[in-house]
Amino acid sequence: MNHYEFVQTDSIHFLKEWPKDEKIDVVFVDDWHSYPHVKKQLELLDQLVGPSSIILLHDLMYGNTDPFYHADLSHAGPQWDEGGPYRAVAELNPQFWEWSTLPWNNRLTILRKKYSNKYHRR
């Protein structure tokens, strides 16, 4: 009996194909880092996670060894366009999302959707 499945594929396609009635417990996002791409991933994940799900994102503090978020990474190339993954996460509504970043090795962010009677069924 498998309790996990490792899948290596295009993330947008994968998330679009995932059954909406099957919640994802843990997902690790370390993909193309442009703002539009990460924003789309988070929009799709919004439908697939609940308050007990965890989304792990890599590289929100990418760019140097200091533990600071970077919204402008135009110097880093097109993969970081328009603010990169930090901007996509920073724009999430804090009423419905909470997150924290561990400041080591380009940083690991833990993102969780908060429970809301308005938007979630138990």
Locate each region found by the language model.
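S-adenosylmethionine/decaboxylated-SAM
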Residues: 1-122
